[in-house]
Structure formats: structure tokens, C-alpha cells
Amino acid sequence: PYEGMAFDEYISKFPQAVSPQFSSLDKFPILVKFLDVEKPISIQVHPSDENAGPGEEGKAEAWYIVSANPGARIYYGLKEPITKEQLKQHALAGTLEQVVNQAPVQPGQVWYNHPGILHSLEGGALVAEVQQNSDTTYRVYDFNRKDAQGNLRELHLEKAAEVIDYTPQQGAEKAIQSKKAGANALSALFSCEYFKMKRLDVETRIELCCKEESFQCLLFLEGKGNILFAGERFAFQAGDCYFLPAGLGAYEVEGAC
């Protein structure tokens, strides 16, 4: 009955697939996507739900580093305390990189870009991103890139200056390193008030369960295999993402991933 149905139509018709509390008028709470980073992402910040501007929404996100070239690095938070005016001066002078932490990234790391944290990524990396379903981004420095008309892309310095977390960060110490928990294992990876991330390792087969309180998304980063449910097999390979409705119950994953 769902074949050919767009995802937004599906959750509108079957809101209980998201959670018992979800309404057909609600916005799906998260986005799951890949970022293929070659050129630097602009140094940016996202507001929280509390300090987002009129008509805007907060945005928290987590990056899982799938692969990274030698030299790939993240920009993450301020090195030392500075004022709003100093921050804007650095952004306009093109010297913001001098006051932002930089750290190498490695496959298996999780970086939590909480609302207010200055962040960017460069040097060649594939990232699996989980985020609040929001596109609110305040661009602070864009490495002097130009748009199709040859103009420097717009910055959002006034908005950014009001929401930035000015607490100095410690760079690489903020990374969570993912580790394999076993041959067939599901282990906790990262949790915040907006979403939870777990690591699934499968060498043969594992039994899992999707309970009534929430949906699950299975994002496969490597390997191939099948999801087994109610006597059916649903094939997957690296890059596939499956939505499992709340209350689905017991299912299995077989293969290698």
C-alpha cells in the first residue's frame, strides 16, 4: 500500500509510524543525510530553538566521519574568549581561522555540533549527518567564495554573534570515537535531547526490535545484507537508509555491515 508514496505523504497518513505522540500536522523531527566534503564548508553556526529568529528553527546536528583524506580537519569552537565585536572583526578581515580550533578528523569519530558552536569541515571527508529537521544556518566566514554572479556570498554576522557559544572549546577532545562492540552487536554511540545514535555491527545475524515509542532509521555505511521481517527480506548495501515505523516489533539484520 506504500509503493510510490512520498515519505511526507506517508507520515501524514500514518503519523503513528513516527511515534504515538506524533500528529499528521507535525514536522518530521530529524534529517539523515550524507555530506561529501571536498571544498571547505563555510564556518557557520546554528541557533537553538530558544534563540532562533522569527520564523526560524533551532538546529543541533551530529557528524559521523565515514571516511577522511589525510589532512581533513574540522573547525570546532573558539580557542579562547573573545567579544562579539572581535569575532565580527575577524570574520570581516578573513582571520577567523586564527581564533577557531582546528583538529584532524578520522573515520569512526562523532562530532556533536550543538547549537551555538562555530564549525566547519575541509580537506575531503564523507560524513553521515543526523540533525534536527531545520535549515537555519548563520554563515560567519565563507573563505571569500563568490556566487554565480561573482558576488561574495552573504554572511549573517549580526545574527551569528547573538547565538554563538563563546565558551572556549578543546578541539579534538570533543570527538567521540566509535568502537566495534562485538561481531553482532548494537551499542550506544551518541545521545542528545533531539536524537540518539547507535552503532550496529553485523558479521552474521542479529535480532533487533523497534518499539512503540519511536521510529528507527537504519543507515548502512558499509557491506551488504538483508533486513528480515515477517517472512520477507529487504536487501541493503552501503549507502542505503531504511525507515522502520514505531511499533514494528522484532526484526533481524543478516549479512556483513
PLM features: residue spans?
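An exposed, glycine/acidic-rich loop-and-rim segment of catalytic or binding clefts
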Residues: 93, 99, 110-112, 117-172
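Short, structured beta-strand/loop micro-motifs enriched in basic residues and often containing a Trp
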Residues: 89-97, 222-226
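Functionally critical, mid-to-C-terminal surface segments that flank or help form catalytic/ligand
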Residues: 155-213
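Ligand-binding loop in jelly-roll beta-barrel domains
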Residues: 27, 35-40, 56-58, 68-71, ...
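Transition-metal
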Residues: 1-82, 142-172, 197
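Short acidic-glycine-tyrosine-enriched beta hairpin
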Residues: 99-112, 228-248
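Structured binding elements
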Residues: 218
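Short beta-strand segments in beta-sandwich/barrel cores
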Residues: 206-208, 223-228, 241
